[in-house]
Design a protein with these regions (language model features):
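Mid-core helix/loop region of P-loop NTP-binding domains shared across ATPases and GTPases
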Residues: 145-178
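Glycine- and acidic
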Residues: 14-22, 51-57, 119-120, 168-177
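Conserved lysine of the Walker
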Residues: 65
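P-loop NTPase motor core
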Residues: 28, 38, 58, 68, ...
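N-terminal pre-Walker A segment at the start of P-loop NTPase domains
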Residues: 4-41
């Protein structure tokens, strides 16, 4: 019998940072990052676009779709508190294949605001209850991007629209009209 210590298997873990910090077994799927971005080019040069405008990740239930999407978010997400600081990103992705491509990491790691929504908590006994839960989810996601309100890249109309999306009561008011 071997005295080798084995890492625990992650069960019901759908958060990449949690998976990495709890020292569980992890299959490195970071090469997917480059694969997804391989077909994406700037909007200025549509002639180079090889892929689709839509990416569909299909897997059976409990096969890590949410974890994969969370890995994308963890890699791309800009820090609201300290834009440009990627030290947390480097810590999470230490030892993964993606860090071998410095040019790719410099271009994408920690550079984008990422809107990630999971609908697993948006349920209810009827449409109105489910809609209210969805409004809570959307407003919660929008709250993560409050720092963008100070960005000179948003005009007044975009900021007003963001304010509405961030307001849970505003979002819920649409269900009340039905």
């Amino acid at each position: 019998m071997s005295n080798k210590q084995f890492l625990p298997l992650p069960t019901s873990v759908d958060n990449f940072a949690e998976l990495i910090t709890t020292s569980c077994y992890y299959v490195d799927k970071t090469p997917y990052l480059k694969e997804v971005f391989a077909d994406i080019t700037t909007a200025d040069d549509k002639s180079k676009v090889k892929g689709s405008n839509v990416l569909l990740f299909t897997r059976p239930r409990r096969f890590g779709k949410t974890l994969l999407m969370n890995m994308f978010e963890s890699f791309l997400q800009i820090s609201g508190k300290n834009p440009g600081n990627i030290s947390k990103h480097l810590n999470y992705f230490k030892g993964t294949k993606i860090l071998e491509d410095q040019e790719f990491c410099d271009k994408y790691m920690g550079q984008c605001p990422v809107i990630a929504i999971t609908l697993k908590d948006a349920s209810g006994d009827d449409f109105k209850d489910a809609y209210f839960k969805l409004a809570e989810v959307v407003a919660g996601v929008a709250a993560k991007f409050e720092f963008l309100m100070g960005s000179p890249k948003l005009n007044a109309k975009e900021k007003a629209k963001f304010d509405k999306i961030s307001d849970e009561n505003y979002l819920k008011s649409f269900a009340k009209k039905t």
